[in-house]
Amino acid sequence: TAGNAVGTWSASFGDQIDIVASNNDGMGMAMFNAWSKENKVPTFGYDANSDAVAAIGDGYGGTISQHADVQAYLTLRVLRNALDGVDVNTGISVADEAGNVLKEGEDYVYNADQRSYYALNLAVTADNYKDFLDATVPFASVAKQLDAAKNPEKKVWLNIYNSADNFLGATYQPLLQKYDKLLNLNVEYIAGDGQTESN
């Protein structure tokens, strides 16, 4: 594990380790708790998992928010728009009837060649971490309920590739479950294990 690895590295390199950068907060927190916190070595991760964000107050160096609130919204909004047969940008770059709208270039970018929306990452530091303590709060500018008379309930089947993943299970899916209600979507979530394609 990452916690064991940092112990091995510190035994080999001692005080030559000046900073720890991790590909995700799960590993970052394992290293922080096992070694970095006690040795006051700045440790950084990625995902803005709730435990990592809270640990910034205890010396965790920082993390990167994938803007999961915008990711989850975009996932379900594109589905809602397709099911309703409306312009794909409704509720994204163009306000819907409820007033839901995102700012292109600030909240997300659209890549026309890939026909893809991308939520923009945000740095989470000691200066702003308190704003990110609850990673499952819907993004305010797209948290308005659609009118069920104009946007009747639709059924959706959605696979979560690896439900054991901390980001997907603890942040992304809870956000999807909040947005599905706001967008009048009855979503059946299928939990994958990240390994077996048959499930």
Residue ranges and their predicted role:
Residues 1, 25, 154-182, 188-199:
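Extracytoplasmic "Venus flytrap"
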Residues 1, 58-69, 189-193:
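Short beta-strand elements at the ligand-binding edges of bilobed clamshell
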Residues 1-54, 76, 176, 199:
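Hydrophobic alpha-helical
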Residues 14-18, 36-42, 58-62, 153-155, ...:
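Loop/turn elements at helix/coil->beta-strand transitions in domains of secreted/extracellular proteins
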Residues 23-32, 56-57, 66-89:
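Extracellular/periplasmic ligand-binding modules, especially the Venus flytrap/periplasmic-binding
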Residues 48-61, 122-124:
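Flexible loop/hinge segments that line or gate small-molecule binding clefts
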Residues 53, 130-135, 165-170:
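Short, solvent-exposed loop/turn elements at domain surfaces
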Residues 78-154:
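Hinge/cleft segment of the Venus flytrap/periplasmic-binding protein
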